[in-house]
Design a protein with these regions (language model features):
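Short, surface-exposed interaction loops/tails
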Residues: 113-163
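Membrane-proximal N-terminal amphipathic helix
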Residues: 40-69
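Alpha-helical hydrophobic helix detector
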Residues: 18-34
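N-terminal leader/signal peptides at the extreme start of proteins
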Residues: 1-10
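Alpha-helix N-cap/helix-initiation motif
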Residues: 7, 16, 40-44
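Extracellular/periplasmic head regions of type IV pilus-like filament subunits
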Residues: 63-122
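Phosphate-coordinating loops and pocket residues in cytosolic domains that bind phosphorylated ligands
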Residues: 37
Length: 163
């Protein structure tokens, strides 16, 4: 005689689904903080790289001025970059925090400030309108009475650290 095969369900049991959800939750709890840490590290590296590019632009500007017999004066180093970064918003003077949103650079002619509004949290920096900015100031390098170079420095009053 012919026997009929029993009809069995091939789905997941409730216990199996709960175990999968718990495992996914644990993986998410581990992965999400690491993802934020990686994005903060990437932002720190990007800021350091941009500062190095701007310092190089200032050095090239100084060299050109000497070669042309022109005086060296503080100016916006973003103007000297061959490829201005897409996150540079231009001159922001007087400072309006809404003109330099998170992750953007701007230049303040008053004081020769290069300003960056970080996405990641920082302690210290310069505060305006509830926003914290990282400030680099263009300073003259002098020999006697001659300006022989320009450099970017942080001002002790606006020191910062990444959280």
């Amino acid at each position: 005689m012919w026997r009929c095969k029993e009809n069995s369900d091939s789905g997941f049991t409730l216990i199996e689904l709960v175990i999968v959800i718990v495992v996914l939750g644990i993986l998410a709890a581990i992965a999400i903080p690491r993802l934020f840490s990686v994005s903060k590290e990437a932002e720190i590296a990007t800021v350091d790289n941009m500062v190095a590019n701007l310092e190089s632009a200032l050095a090239i500007y100084v060299s050109k001025q000497y070669m042309d017999g022109q005086p060296v004066a503080a100016h916006n180093p973003f103007d000297d970059l061959t490829n201005v970064p897409s996150n540079y918003v231009g001159v922001n003077d007087p400072v309006n925090p809404t003109n330099t949103p998170d992750g953007k650079w701007s230049f303040r002619t008053t004081g020769g400030w290069i300003m960056y509004n970080p996405k990641a949290a920082i302690t210290g920096g310069w505060t305006s309108g509830g926003e914290r900015f990282i400030i680099y100031q263009i300073q003259a390098v002098v020999d006697g009475t001659d300006t022989v170079g320009l450099r970017l420095t942080t001002t002790p009053a606006y020191d910062y650290s990444w959280n």
